[in-house]
Swiss-Prot record:
It catalyses: phosphate(out) + ATP + H2O = ADP + 2 phosphate(in) + H(+). It holds the Pfam family ABC_tran. One of its GO terms (molecular function) is ATPase-coupled phosphate ion transmembrane transporter activity. It comes from Ligilactobacillus salivarius (strain UCC118). Part of the ABC transporter complex PstSACB involved in phosphate import. Responsible for energy coupling to the transport system. It is found in: Cell membrane. This is Phosphate import ATP-binding protein PstB 1. NCBIfam families: 3a0107s01c2.
């Protein structure tokens, strides 16, 4: 079946609800265009899932939200955070990433102790007081639901942790910088079901303090944890709505076919 990629439904939010917004976002890898006119608004203190087949543009889109594609892709359009376009050449990228953090698909702890994994960036940003560092380590590990498992082994190598623990450590490391927004690129795809459930539980708790945007291939996961869902296809955002509506009453036929498994 052929679909009209201009047939779209994109939910619009109230101005006060927005934590982040993209306007006419187009992304190119050389001459190949990977994203077409991406216009999305993300609500504060909610989880938004980005779904779609491999190569649909969702990870490319996610990485653009804190300029992780810089030097690899040509990004055109606006990404507005607190009313400021973070694509502006005047923006200090490293400073901006304190506010818009990233957790990658595979756990990537530093080959340092658990404690040093969290304090390394803090020290680089001028926090030297030992009591303050210890406080942030404890708070971050508690928010990532890891403190009780590692509190007596903070000097242990992070590489000795299980995969699920390593991923929660990476989440703790990211939130130690006190970001407003946390981007997660398939954070549970490399984990077993028990570790995945723990990550999902952690994310649901984190949205009380952070805005979360997550790429997932797992539609059941998207339906379980997200408030909003955006469906990507061939570099286009086809539908963006509240998750319940996406999964029970999609407005676009292409979305319906993808969700129901009748795609293609």
């Amino acid at each position: 079946m052929e679909y009209n990629l201009k047939d779209k439904y994109i939910l619009q939010l109230n101005e006060k609800e927005k934590a982040l917004e993209t306007r006419d976002l187009n992304i190119f890898y050389g001459e190949k265009q990977a994203l077409f006119d991406g216009n999305l608004q993300f609500e504060r203190y909610k989880i938004t899932s980005l779904i779609g087949a491999s190569g649909s543009g969702k990870s490319t889109f996610l990485r653009s939200l804190n300029r992780m594609n810089e030097g690899v892709a040509d990004v055109k359009g606006s990404i507005l955070y607190r009313g400021i376009d973070i694509n502006s050449p005047k923006i200090n990228v490293y400073e901006m990433r304190k506010y818009i953090g990233m957790v990658f698909q595979r756990p990537n702890p530093f080959s340092k102790s658990i404690y040093e994994n969290i304090t390394f960036a803090l020290k680089e940003n001028g926090i030297k007081d030992k009591e303050k560092l210890a406080e942030i380590v404890e708070t971050s590990l508690k928010q990532a639901a890891l403190w009780d498992e590692v509190k007596d082994d903070l000097n242990k190598s992070a590489l000795a942790l299980s995969g699920g623990q390593q991923q929660r450590l990476c989440i703790a490391r990211a939130i130690a910088m006190k970001p407003d927004i946390l981007l997660l690129d398939e954070p549970a795809s490399a984990l077993d079901p028990i570790s995945t459930a723990k990550i999902e539980e952690t994310l649901l708790e984190l949205k009380e303090k952070y805005t979360l945007i997550i790429v997932t291939h797992n539609m059941q996961q998207a339906s379980r944890i997200s408030d909003y869902t955006a469906f990507f296809h061939l570099g286009n955002v086809i539908e963006y709505n509240k998750t319940k509506n996406i999964f029970t009453n999609p407005k676009i036929k292409l979305t319906e076919d993808y969700i129901s498994g009748n795609f293609g």
